[in-house]
Swiss-Prot record:
Binds 2 manganese ions per subunit. It comes from the Eukaryota. This is Probable Xaa-Pro aminopeptidase P. Belongs to the peptidase M24B family. Catalyzes the removal of a penultimate prolyl residue from the N-termini of peptides. Keywords: Aminopeptidase, Hydrolase, Manganese, Metal-binding, Metalloprotease, Protease. One of its GO terms (biological process) is proteolysis. Mn(2+) 1 binds at residues 464, 562, 576. Mn(2+) 2 binds at residues 453, 464, 576. Pfam families: Creatinase_N, Creatinase_N_2, Peptidase_M24, Peptidase_M24_C. One of its GO terms (cellular component) is cytoplasm. It comes from Talaromyces stipitatus (strain ATCC 10500 / CBS 375.48 / QM 6759 / NRRL 1006) (Penicillium stipitatum). Its EC number is 3.4.11.9.
């Protein structure tokens, strides 16, 4: 029998230091077949009337003596992209972007998000909401706005399963200074309002990720983790982040759109391996893959087991109980279940660090899948230009996105998309994470900028590519902006730097040419990319986030290189390649340390009619010509029977004039 993820009507409240009794997430009684194509979930760029939802939420807040309630974007595993049943912030606010935090008081409501979503949030939020543009001068953070609303000894509530323990502690300290208090609400209030309309929690089958793609047996990965535990003198590692579990066990799932992960937890000790996952997800083949050393336990039992695990922790030489280690992304609920900071060390995950450094098999897979993906993109752009210019066809943004997915699906090892395709024309290209919806999206204008940011999941890797084209005559400003963005992409692509350098330190390289003109973009320059895993992968990245300064780049890291420029209501430009860090030879070896550079793997032409060649240096012109020669060499063989695409590729990869 099918049933909805519906919370009980009685709500429990707990203070920061109190133990929690967590209810298991509801589960459907069936399993769906693992799919090999992706359903693309579109986003309405229209406002949703949230008055009734907010009224119901405030009534529940009143019943539970709450003055303020926080609704984060994340799920119980701190996933950036979530299953539809976990889209609570979207439900209560109407804002559909992937990042943001909603805060509701008895008299006001605010949503905080970053620069990728300023335009989208402004369009989607109704008059009940105040938009907090994160990072802008004079704009309160959501934590500051919460503290302001809670002044005078008020009570702030949050579901402890969807906020990290570190965030909860920091917010609690801030609130206590003003005489206020943070409490954890065991049953999510938004779930109460959503009720029977809340989507079912996915229960997809798990698949083995073969060694031919993984490159390393999962037993060796666990052995490496145990060495880390021995070095740190910890009793075990509690794994709560979904892509870390998928990577660690060489498994892939289908529980979250575009991300091949599955709902689970794991506990690794020097002697045991426990995987907390619904048994119905595991086929006999997967159980054989895991072997007898991996003990399968029910997904929801992690919280019940937590107390017992911490109670029987081995002793240190001094006789004190040894702590467990967990990621700094672990939820407040999980932390409290293990006994909090006294029993649990929260740190950057060693699994995350290891996963970010791809082995040679994974790197080869990333190279190979980007060649196939580049061929798919080339076929798409050739088709699109022919339809718009020669056939005078009328195509909307969704038509384009659907055609691109159709082309990709023909290629070897294709599984699905890695995120919603951003197919955007004219002013829509200025909406950084724009997602078109059939019926309300725009017709692609051949006389305007067209920006396409898209990616796919292949068995041997994950892709993410952005290209900006103009199929007619671009304006002088469009060409200038495009060329400045291109110069930034080249600057990062060709960077050479000593080992130990972080992505934080490299960010200015991609922005420098825009900065000289007084221009900039409100998003990071690059993010880590998984190997047939999440398209956004930590802990590395290129940008101004503080966490990017805490992790240096290493050979084997795979990141995006994607500077951009956007003029609201006019156009947007972004160029994105995927690049891999590697050791490079230099004339000298200052400090006797390795020096690193990048290898680009994206193989798709860069729109030449948008390049103002007079703004390029001799070296930059040579880079463009060399890049296009490489694209031709690696992808032209796909089009021996496709004259239209081959001719378009030849045109777009000619040396600059």
């Amino acid at each position: 029998m099918l049933f909805s993820c519906r919370a009980p009507s009685l709500l429990q409240r707990t203070a920061l230091s109190s133990p929690l009794r967590l209810f298991a997430p509801c589960r459907p009684s069936f399993s769906r077949t693992f799919v090999t194509t992706t359903v693309r979930f579109s986003v309405e760029m229209e406002t949703v009337n949230t008055s009734e939802r907010l009224a119901q939420l405030r009534e529940l807040m009143k019943q539970n003596n709450l003055d303020v309630y926080i609704v984060p974007s994340e799920d119980s595993h701190q996933s950036e992209y979530i299953a539809h049943c976990d889209a609570r912030r979207e439900f209560i606010s109407g804002f559909t972007g992937s990042a943001g935090t909603a805060v509701i008081s008895t008299t006001a409501a605010a949503l905080s998000t970053d620069g990728r979503y300023f335009n989208q949030a402004a369009k989607q939020l109704d008059s009940n909401w105040k938009l907090l543009k994160r990072g802008l001068e004079g704009v309160l953070t959501w934590q500051e706005w919460t503290a302001e609303q809670a002044e005078g000894g008020k009570i702030v509530g949050v579901d402890p399963s969807v906020i990290t323990a570190a965030s909860a502690r920091k917010l609690s300290e801030t609130l206590e200074k003003g005489g206020s208090k943070l409490v954890g609400i065991e049953q999510n209030l938004v779930d109460q309002i959503w009720g029977t309309h809340r989507p079912q929690r996915p229960s997809e089958k798990v698949k083995i990720h073969p060694i031919e793609y993984a490159g390393k047996p999962f037993q060796e990965k666990i052995a490496d983790l145990r060495k880390e535990l021995k070095t740190k003198k910890r009793a075990g590692f509690i794994v709560s982040v979904l892509d870390e579990i998928a990577w660690l066990f060489n498994l892939r799932g289908n529980d979250i759109p575009y991300n091949p992960v599955f709902f689970s937890y794991a506990v690794i000790t020097p002697d045991t391996v426990d995987l907390y996952i619904d048994d119905e997800k595991l086929s006999p083949e997967v159980k054989v893959h895991l072997g007898s050393d991996v003990v399968i336990k029910p997904y929801e039992s992690i919280f019940a087991d937590a107390k017992a695990l911490s109670a029987k922790a081995p002793l240190t030489e001094s006789g004190a109980p040894m702590k467990y280690l967990t990621s700094n992304k672990a939820s407040w609920a999980l932390s409290l279940s293990f006994g909090g900071e006294k029993k649990l060390d929260e740190a950057r995950s060693p699994i995350s660090d290891a996963k970010a450094i791809k082995n040679e098999v994974e790197l080869k897979g990333m190279r190979d899948c980007h060649i196939r993906d580049g061929a798919a993109l080339t076929e798409y752009f050739a088709w699109l230009e022919n339809e718009l210019i020669n056939k005078k066809s009328t195509l909307d943004e969704v038509d384009g996105a659907d055609k691109l997915e159709q082309i990709r699906s023909k290629h070897d090892k294709f599984v699905g998309l890695s995120f919603d395709t951003i197919s955007s024309t004219g002013p829509n290209a200025a909406v950084i994470h724009y997602k078109p919806e059939k019926g309300v999206c725009s017709v692609i204008d051949p006389n305007a900028i067209y920006l396409c940011d898209s990616g796919a999941q292949y068995l041997d890797g994950t892709t993410d590519t952005t290209r900006t084209f103009h199929f007619s005559t671009p304006t002088e400003m469009e060409k200038k902006a495009f060329t400045l963005v291109l110069k930034g992409l080249i600057a990062l692509d060709t960077a050479v730097f000593p080992k130990g350098t972080s992505g934080f330190a490299l960010d200015a390289l991609a922005r420098q040419h825009l900065w000289r003109q007084g221009l900039d973009y409100l998003h990071g320059t690059g993010h880590g990319v998984g190997a047939y895993l999440n398209v956004h992968e930590g802990p590395i990245g290129v940008g101004t986030r503080i966490q990017y300064s805490e992790v240096s780049l290493s050979p084997g890291n795979v990141i995006s290189d994607e500077p951009g420029y956007y003029e609201d209501g006019k156009f947007g430009i972004r160029i994105e390649n995927i690049i891999m860090a590697r050791e490079v030879e230099t004339p000298y070896k200052f400090g006797d340390k390795p020096w690193l550079g990048f290898e680009h793997v994206t193989m798709t032409p860069i729109g030449q009619n948008l390049i103002e060649t007079s703004l390029l240096s001799k070296e930059e012109r040579q880079w463009v010509d060399n890049y296009h020669a490489e694209v031709w060499e690696k992808t032209s063989g796909f089009f021996k029977q496709d004259e239209l695409t081959l001719n378009w590729l030849k045109k777009e990869t000619q040396p600059l004039k």
